[in-house]
C-alpha cells in the first residue's frame, strides 16, 4: 500500500513539475501577467468551455492597463499579449517580415493549404495569387449576384413575417449569407437538399475542437502527426464540390465572374511564383490544383458565412435598440436608392456613408474575428520595452480589449456610429480598430464581407423596421 502511495505521489509530482516547468518564464524576465494554473496556463475557462477565449484575453487586457505587454501562458507555452498600439503597429505592419506567420501549424492535407492558415512562402504565394481577386473592380461583378439573392431573401422573409412578425434574426440572415456565399463562390442555386447538407457542414466547421489547445501545448505537433483542425468530413464535400463545378465549366472560366471563375482565370497561368525570398524560406511555386482551389473556396465560405450573419444580427439588434439611429439609416437608404433607381451598385454603397459608420461601429462593439496571433521568425526586441521575444514565440492581440478600451473609445458600451465619422477616424490610431486584422495579413475578403452585410441590411430596411421583442436578449 505504501509503495502504491509513493509511486502515485511521485508520479503526480513529476506531472506537476512537467506541467509547470515554464511558469516562471515571464517572472524571470520581469514581465507582469496573471498567475497561471497548472496544465491550463491562463486559459483554463476556455479549455473547459466555460468562457470564450476572446473574453479571457479581453479580461487580461483590462487587468493590466498600465502595461505595454503582458506575459501569459497558452496552456504551458509562454506567449506575449500586446497592449500598446505602437508595439502592435510594429509587429503587424512595420516589422511584418518577422511576424508573417500565424503560428498554428497543421497538415496541408484536407483543406489545410488555405490562405488564412498557410504560413511562410506558401502564404506569400497564395497572397500574391489571390489578392487581385478581391479588388473593388473584381468584386463589383458580385454585387449583382448579392442583390439578386437579396431580392429572393426579402420575398421569403415577407412570407415568414406574414405568418409571424416576431422572428429570431440570426436564423433568418443565415439564410441570406448561405445563399449569397454559395452563389458568389460557386454559382450555385440552393435546393432543400443542399441547404440541409450545408447546415450539417456548418455545425462541423464551427464546432470547436481541442486541436488548438494541443498545438498550444506542443507547437507544431499537429503538422508532425499530419492532423488537422477540421473534421475529416468537411474536406470531401469541398473537394467534390470544387471538382464538380470545374468539370461543369470545362475547366475554364465562364462569363459569370464569381469566385470560381476568377480562380479558373488564375489557373490558366498554371503556376504562381512568390514575390520575393525572405530569411531562410525557399522560393517555391504553387500549382492551382483542384485540392488547392477547394481549400480556398472552403475558407471563403467559412469566413464569409457565419461572420457576416453574426454581424448582421448584431447590427439589427443595435438598430432595434436605437430607433433614432435606425431612422437615420432608413432615410439614407431610401434617398440613395431613389437617386440610383433602386439599384445597389458600387456607387450606391459608397454614398451610404452613415450605414458604413453603423457597420464599423457594429464590428467595433462585436468583433467577430477577434484574436490576432503572430509568430516571431527571429529573436525580437519589443520596441519601447525591455522584453525580447525568442524565435518561435507567439504574440497575441486582443481586438476585443482594444475596441472596449475607454482610452480609444469613451463610454465603449454605447453604440455610437459617430465614432467612425471621417474626422474621428483620422484622429485615431490605425491599430485602434482591427476587426479584420492589420498589415499584410488583414482579411482579404473584408470588402466582400462588408458589401454582403450592407446589401442585406439595405434590402431589409427598404421593407421593414426592427423593434426589440419581449424575447430579445439585452446582452450578448
UniProtKB/Swiss-Prot annotation:
Compartments where located: Endoplasmic reticulum membrane; Microsome membrane
A GO CC annotation given for this chain: endoplasmic reticulum membrane
Expression induction or repression: By furnocoumarin.
Cofactor: heme
Keyword Oxidoreductase: yes
Residues involved in heme binding: 443
One example GO MF annotation: heme binding
Protein name: Cytochrome P450 6B5
Function: Enables the insect to feed on furanocoumarin-producing plants and evolved as an adaptation for detoxification of xanthotoxin and other furanocoumarins.
Topology relative to the membrane: Peripheral membrane protein
Family membership noted in the UniProt record: Belongs to the cytochrome P450 family.
Enzyme Commission (EC) number: 1.14.14.1
Keywords, sorted A to Z: Endoplasmic reticulum, Heme, Iron, Membrane, Metal-binding, Microsome, Monooxygenase, Oxidoreductase
PROSITE patterns for this protein: CYTOCHROME_P450 (PS00086)
Lineage start: Eukaryota, Metazoa, Ecdysozoa, Arthropoda, Hexapoda
Keyword check for Cell membrane: no
Pfam families per record: p450 (PF00067)
Amino acid at each position: 500500500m505504501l509503495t502504491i502511495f509513493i509511486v502515485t505521489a511521485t508520479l503526480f509530482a513529476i506531472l506537476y513539475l512537467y506541467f509547470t516547468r515554464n511558469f516562471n518564464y515571464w517572472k524571470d524576465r520581469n514581465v507582469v501577467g496573471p498567475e497561471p494554473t497548472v496544465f491550463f496556463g491562463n486559459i483554463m475557462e476556455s479549455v473547459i468551455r466555460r468562457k470564450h477565449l476572446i473574453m479571457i484575453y479581453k479580461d487580461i487586457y483590462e487587468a493590466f492597463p498600465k502595461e505595454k505587454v503582458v506575459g501569459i501562458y497558452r496552456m504551458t507555452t509562454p506567449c506575449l499579449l500586446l497592449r500598446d498600439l505602437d508595439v502592435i503597429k510594429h509587429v503587424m505592419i512595420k516589422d511584418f517580415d518577422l511576424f508573417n506567420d500565424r503560428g498554428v501549424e497543421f497538415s496541408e492535407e484536407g483543406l489545410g493549404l488555405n490562405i488564412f492558415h498557410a504560413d511562410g512562402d506558401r502564404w506569400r504565394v497564395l497572397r500574391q495569387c489571390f489578392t487581385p481577386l478581391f479588388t473593388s473592380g473584381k468584386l463589383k461583378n458580385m454585387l449583382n449576384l448579392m442583390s439578386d439573392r437579396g431580392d429572393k431573401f426579402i420575398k421569403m422573409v415577407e412570407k415568414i413575417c406574414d405568418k409571424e412578425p416576431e422572428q429570431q434574426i440570426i436564423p433568418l440572415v443565415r439564410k441570406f449569407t448561405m445563399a449569397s456565399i454559395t452563389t458568389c463562390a460557386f454559382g450555385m442555386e440552393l435546393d432543400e437538399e443542399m441547404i440541409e447538407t450545408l447546415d450539417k457542414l456548418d455545425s462541423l466547421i464551427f464546432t470547436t475542437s481541442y486541436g488548438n489547445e494541443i498545438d498550444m501545448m506542443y507547437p507544431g505537433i499537429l503538422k508532425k502527426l499530419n492532423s488537422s483542425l477540421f473534421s475529416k468530413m468537411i474536406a470531401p464535400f469541398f473537394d467534390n464540390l470544387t471538382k464538380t463545378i470545374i468539370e461543369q465549366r470545362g475547366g475554364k472560366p465562364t462569363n459569370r465572374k464569381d469566385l470560381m471563375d476568377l480562380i479558373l482565370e488564375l489557373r490558366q497561368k498554371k503556376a504562381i511564383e512568390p514575390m520575393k525570398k525572405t530569411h531562410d524560406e525557399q522560393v517555391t511555386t504553387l500549382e492551382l490544383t483542384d485540392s488547392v482551389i477547394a481549400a480556398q473556396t472552403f475558407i471563403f465560405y467559412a469566413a464569409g458565412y457565419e461572420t457576416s450573419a453574426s454581424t448582421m444580427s448584431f447590427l439589427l439588434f443595435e438598430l432595434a435598440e436605437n430607433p433614432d439611429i435606425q431612422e437615420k439609416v432608413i432615410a439614407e437608404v431610401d434617398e440613395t436608392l431613389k437617386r440610383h433607381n433602386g439599384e445597389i451598385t458600387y456607387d450606391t454603397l459608397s454614398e451610404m456613408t452613415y450605414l458604413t459608420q453603423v457597420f464599423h461601429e457594429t464590428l467595433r462593439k462585436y468583433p467577430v474575428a477577434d484574436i490576432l496571433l503572430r509568430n516571431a521568425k527571429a529573436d525580437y526586441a519589443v520596441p519601447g520595452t525591455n522584453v525580447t521575444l525568442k524565435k518561435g514565440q507567439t504574440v497575441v492581440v486582443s481586438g476585443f480589449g482594444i475596441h472596449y478600451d475607454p482610452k480609444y473609445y469613451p463610454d465603449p458600451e454605447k453604440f455610437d456610429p459617430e465614432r467612425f465619422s471621417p474626422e474621428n477616424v483620422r484622429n485615431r490610431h490605425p491599430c485602434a480598430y482591427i476587426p479584420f486584422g492589420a498589415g499584410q495579413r488583414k482579411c482579404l475578403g473584408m470588402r466582400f464581407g462588408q458589401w454582403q452585410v450592407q446589401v442585406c441590411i439595405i434590402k431589409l430596411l427598404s421593407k421593414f423596421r426592427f423593434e426589440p421583442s419581449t424575447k430579445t436578449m439585452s446582452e450578448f
